[in-house]
Amino acid sequence: MFFLCLVCLSVSHKMIGICYLLVAILCGFIGYIYSLFIRLELSLIGCGVLFGDYQFYNVLITSHGLIMVFAFIMPITMGGFTNYFAPVMVGFPDMVFPRINNMSFWMFIGGFGCLVSGFLTEEGMGVGWTLYPTLICIDFHSSLACDFIIFSVHFLGISSILNSINVVGTIFCCRRKYFSFLIWTLFIWGALLTSILLIITLPVLAGGVTLLLCDRNFNTSFYDVVGGGDLVLFQHLFWFFGHPEVYIIILPVFGLVSTIIEVTSFRCVFSSVAMIYSMLLISVLGMFVWAHHMFVVGMDVDSRAYFGSITVLIGLPTCIKLFNWIYSFLFTDMCICFEIYFIYMFILMFLAGGLTGLFLSNVGIDILMHDTYFVVAHFHYVLSLGAVVGVFGGFFHFLMKWIPIELHTFWLFFFISTLWFGSNMVFFPLHSLGMFAFPRRISDYPISFLFWSAFTLYGMLLLTFLVIFCCCLFNVILFWDYCLFFINLFTYSLSIFFYFYTWVPVCMAIYLLVIDFAHIILDYLLIILCFCFVFYIFFWQAFLLFFYI
């Protein structure tokens, strides 16, 4: 009860940041399970593991996208790391609005609850994470699940806006007099620009989905062509938020990467002022390129040329950041530590995603590649491999500040090598599949795509093995934590017994010790069952693939 009150009512920015991290990791685990079922379904042609239920396949696609974007990566970067470190880096004891900070966390919990409710209600919400009106309108999806999704977007958006207002207020109101903006850390600049982007773009998304809710329930026709509405209007409203969302996710990761380089090299990143201006330019230009997601809706030639040119122009400040990081690696005496390898991996993956983005900025190529797996590979290399790897680097870098342990070097290198090979096995073949017009959001395909589509499953199983390994590592950490806690509790109980001559404290300590050790044993049995499930799927898939070939 004391622990629940401590978490529910806490206004400490560090406690709220840790709660954001833990809940976001849980959400990411759920989203990963959805993606595992997606890859299992795509590893076979015809009737796969979902038994031909195409609606449920689209529900998995929708849930995976919304959870990973709104409930995993955004809360980790803005809710977790920014809440924990922003007040410390500006020299303030807490956020400027601590109770609003607590309220934004519980709004995030409510939004995730609505999201899961939409997945479990009736036939689910197979509309795609973009929520286009042609799919989510009442004629095609009369389920209450779609309304839950719209409410979840509202809850998560309000949570992000409150958190962003808090971050901006903390950074500006706590700034000392005669304190130059240019000597802020790059992480603070990333958090500040991300918060400003959220405050500007999220109300536009909220207005768009509110009109969608009215069309579904109040007989309006904002997006109904028969009633005089415009379908493309929602795409403009959504992508005005949707493309800056990429920079909302990646800018705090830029700050984390720069912070790790500064700490390990004992000096600032090369040309910090240029890094600041490049982030400013990325944020400004990112507001004016939303329609490059809409090249196939019938735009005129001038609009296509404008949005394509601005998209290419964003590559300039991005290259400035990449070359400054590379220069900092090559020409500074860095302390070689484990998180540096995460930074290497982040730079390579983000560079690969950026290069494929340059291909898609060409209007003709984008029209050819639209709604294929080439686009899926592009944004997964930027987000799933870029942002998540940067978050891993920041997490391991600051791990010693949260947990007073040191992880073994061999297992750390095992972790990053498995992550490297598994993630590239999953996403790199999607480029070739997309160039041969493998369509998105469709669970069946010709047999000519079977080999590479099944090959990605092996990478997914490798990542599943890595997730189970992380669960084992977490249980080992908790195991030692349990041991130390209950040994101290047992010693304290014995001292009370010898002082008061009563067996009650000793019996309570033994009872708690037995219960928690049984809990640990059950955890390990669950992990063993997960291992068995992964290897069963692996051999089953290999047998069926051999049968098909």
From Swiss-Prot:
Q: What is its EC number?
A: 7.1.1.9
Residues reported in the UniProt entry to bind heme a3: 378
Annotated membrane topology is:
Multi-pass membrane protein
Compartments, as annotated in UniProt: Mitochondrion inner membrane
A biological process term (GO) from this entry: mitochondrial electron transport, cytochrome c to oxygen
Reactions catalysed:
4 Fe(II)-[cytochrome c] + O2 + 8 H(+)(in) = 4 Fe(III)-[cytochrome c] + 2 H2O + 4 H(+)(out)
GO cellular component assignments:
mitochondrial inner membrane
Can you tell me which residues bind Mg(2+)?
Answer: 370-371
Q: Which residues cross the membrane?
A: 18-38, 59-79, 100-120, 148-168, 181-201, 237-257, 279-299, 310-330, 340-360, 379-399, 410-430, 460-480, 495-515, 527-547
User: What's the record's note on cofactor binding?
Assistant: Binds 2 heme A groups non-covalently per subunit.
Instruction: Cite the binding residues for O2.
Output: 247
| Principal subcellular localisation of the protein | mitochondrion
UniProt enzyme class: translocase
Keywords carried by this UniProt record: Calcium, Copper, Electron transport, Heme, Iron, Magnesium, Membrane, Metal-binding, Mitochondrion, Mitochondrion inner membrane, Respiratory chain, Translocase, Transmembrane, Transmembrane helix, Transport
Could you give a GO molecular-function term held by this entry? metal ion binding
Q: Where does Fe(II)-heme a bind?
A: 64, 380
**Position(s), cross-link 1'-histidyl-3'-tyrosine (His-Tyr):** 243-247
Q: Pathway it acts in?
A: Energy metabolism; oxidative phosphorylation
Give the cofactors, semicolon-separated. Answer: heme; Cu cation
Residues holding Ca(2+): 41, 46
Q: Which family does it belong to?
A: Belongs to the heme-copper respiratory oxidase family.
**How would you summarize the oligomeric state and partners of this protein?**
Component of the cytochrome c oxidase (complex IV, CIV), a multisubunit enzyme composed of a catalytic core of 3 subunits and several supernumerary subunits. The complex exists as a monomer or a dimer and forms supercomplexes (SCs) in the inner mitochondrial membrane with ubiquinol-cytochrome c oxidoreductase (cytochrome b-c1 complex, complex III, CIII).
Biological function:
Component of the cytochrome c oxidase, the last enzyme in the mitochondrial electron transport chain which drives oxidative phosphorylation. The respiratory chain contains 3 multisubunit complexes succinate dehydrogenase (complex II, CII), ubiquinol-cytochrome c oxidoreductase (cytochrome b-c1 complex, complex III, CIII) and cytochrome c oxidase (complex IV, CIV), that cooperate to transfer electrons derived from NADH and succinate to molecular oxygen, creating an electrochemical gradient over the inner membrane that drives transmembrane transport and the ATP synthase.
**Protein name (Swiss-Prot/TrEMBL):** Cytochrome c oxidase subunit 1
**Source organism of this protein record:** Trypanosoma brucei brucei
